[in-house]
Regions:
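Active-site beta-strand-loop-beta-strand hairpin of nuclease catalytic cores
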Residues: 75-84
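Nucleic-acid endonuclease domains
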Residues: 1-71, 79, 89-256
């Protein structure tokens, strides 16, 4: 299936227009559409599927928006290849946490599914859109009591199958590792500069000034030992972060 950033952005613009009209209707009748974003997102789910289908028709041979029980939200056909796409619309919780969910029974029955997750802010102005390819039950947590068959995504495995089309998804572990690596480089550079200076002082020092030479040599040894200890400690930190479960943050993109 062909899913482009431009197609997704066009669908978002149409969704925003529909949202504005719906919000106007609510306001005119003394209600606030954004008071309950969960209900708002339910109302916006069909426009999401409809508008994405409309845009995908420009880059695929055949695109059908069905969405009936037991049917995929969108079916995309190119040549003899027919692919299914599940679409989900969600928003951050009041705590800021973002939970991407799926229906366990559908996922278990299909074996593997592609997903489009539209994540909208409360005002429906900024978004993150992610296309996940070939997700399985292993990419989601187990069914919890009271979850009504819904399962939460495990970012640690699912993000390796993700293509972020709108906004950004950042792995905080990558950022931590980058900063540690920069510290290692800086530590090495400072040590090399200091060792160059000490080596020059040693070369310029008279052979007869034994105590002075011994002192410089001692400083060289101390510099090497101290640097290696610092680098070793940083490498341990780097390994610790590498072995930790990744944590992800979402950066929303304003759609005009």
């Amino acid at each position: 299936m062909n899913i482009t950033k431009s197609a997704v952005i066009s669908s978002l613009r149409d969704m925003k227009n529909f949202h504005d009209q719906l919000q106007g209707l609510y306001t005119a009748n003394g209600m606030d559409l954004t008071q309950d974003v969960g209900r708002r997102n339910i109302l916006m789910s069909l426009p999401m599927e409809h508008n994405l289908t409309k845009e995908l028709k420009f880059v695929n041979e055949k695109v059908v928006n069905d969405g009936r029980t037991g049917k995929a939200d969108i079916i995309i056909t190119n040549g003899e290849i027919e692919e299914e796409l599940e679409c989900k619309l969600t928003s951050p919780h009041k705590s800021g946490a973002i939970s991407l969910q799926s229906d366990f029974d559908t996922l278990e029955r299909k074996g593997s599914l592609d997903y489009m997750y539209y994540i909208a802010d409360r005002k429906f102005e900024k978004f993150v859109v992610i296309h996940f390819k070939g997700l399985t039950v292993d990419d989601f947590r187990s069914v919890s009591p009271g979850s009504r068959g819904k399962v939460q995504m495990k970012y640690s495995s699912a993000m390796s199958k993700a293509e972020v089309l709108v906004g950004k998804v950042k792995n905080s572990n990558h950022e931590k590792k980058r900063k540690i690596f920069e510290k290692i480089i800086l530590t090495r550079r400072k040590a090399n500069s200091r060792l160059t200076e000490l080596q020059q002082r040693l070369e310029e020092c008279s052979e007869k000034a034994e105590k002075k030479r011994e002192n410089i040599i001692r400083m060289i040894d101390n510099c090497i030992n101290t640097t290696e200890a610092k680098v070793f400690k940083l490498m341990r930190q780097f390994d610790d972060v590498t072995n930790k479960k990744p944590r992800f943050s979402f950066e929303f993109e304003d759609i005009q």
